Amino acid sequence: MEESILYIKNGTIIDPKENRPYKADLQIENGRISRIIRKEGEHFKISADALALAEGKDSLSAVRQDNAALAEGKVIDAQGLMIAPGLADTHVHFRDPGFTYKEDIYTGAAAAAKGGFTQIVLMANTKPCVDNEDTLSYVLAKGKETGIHIASCVNVTKGMAGKELTDMERLSERGAAGFTDDGIPLLNEELVREAMERAKKLHKPISFHEENPAFIVNNGINRGRASAFYHIGGSPGEAETDLVKRDLELALLTGADVVIQHISTKEAVELVRRAKEKGASVHAEATPHHFTLTEEAAIEKGTLAKMNPPLREEADRLAIIKGLKDGTIDLIATDHAPHSREEKDRPVTEAPSGIIGLETALSLGIRELVEKGHLTWPELIERMSTSPCRLYGLEGGRVEEKAAADLVLFHPQERWTVSEFTSKSSNSPFIGESLPGVVYYTICGGRIVYKKA
């Protein structure tokens, strides 16, 4: 829906710069927040003059048209709803090009909008992978056809082979948001160092999938109770910490903006904490599944709870929450990884790793982090919107006058049951669960791109 002026009244705004949410009304004009009116004291009502200005009519006529304006969607009554900056996810797989039977950019964007996301950063492990200008141009052009903002990382190495760096400078000029070979760990230390140095010069983040295959017998299942249950070797925490330790040292050496992707172990969290204390420009992602579940889910849910890195022990889950709480981990990212039902129905050692997450992320953040007292509302939104946008230089993550009107309106207590998905895929361990947090509207650039039916 395209409207030059949109009013949102009676909402509760979550602004990460504020200590607590506050009641206010918003006015949106031409894709930006033009006015915020705090409700301090007397209840604010959208004035007849304001509506008259919007409609080009006299005040009396505007008063008579108020109900009609509401019905047409020009005024949103957000009573009971929270208004936050549109969520931003910097670790997403839309499988396009190459694997569009799992997801494509259009269906992925629709799933993102339903989950409250207005900004997505795609990973580059498609087919062909995003190591060249043509594939990058394809992804960005298709992204512009959706209702949300879609950026994309490009590969660090050609063909994701870990041997030769891509033309990082040229790809940066063509619109790359950052660099990653996510899905494949980079084992050549000298190559990683050079990549960091070049990324720093380009002022772009470089992200790393930290699992050393030398330690791993079977991906996706933790070496512990879960691997014992399946009688397999599994994947130990050392696989992660080995590469995290190396890359944090290189981050200190090069000064690059380094992102440790989908952190899963208490040891890695502590390593990141120490590196930050030393002054490294390092960032870490936590996925909702890693701060919610443990390896017990892999035993109970099977391949629906198989992902890389795997779900770990309760001590690891609690360490991730502590890291989110004290700022060691500054990004919540879904690692949305769609797979077909046929693929996930394979035996645990053969099924691909990964779960979808865009439509459940906000609810899990509410239940696991806010309702349990680990994060305040502003802190949750900081990690799900403001911090990701800041790191990648994206517009968004703010609710203030003149800011882009990228917003999510949701009811924090209303519950919903995880069942059908907008995504093409349904590989989620949360199916059947009742979760808090229902998205009513997602607004991107002043346009309503999702509205609860």
Enumerate the language-model features and the residues they cover.
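A glycine-rich helix N-cap at a beta->alpha junction
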Residues: 142-156
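N-terminal metal-binding scaffold of metallo-dependent hydrolase/deaminase domains
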Residues: 1-52, 56-62, 66
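Metal-associated gating/positioning segment near the N- to mid-region
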Residues: 78-143
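C-terminal cap of metal-dependent C-N hydrolases
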Residues: 347-350, 404-453
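Divalent metal-coordination and catalytic microenvironments
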Residues: 11, 31, 80, 91, ...
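His/Asp/Glu-enriched, well-ordered alpha-helical/loop segment
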Residues: 229-257, 304, 325-326, 330-332, ...
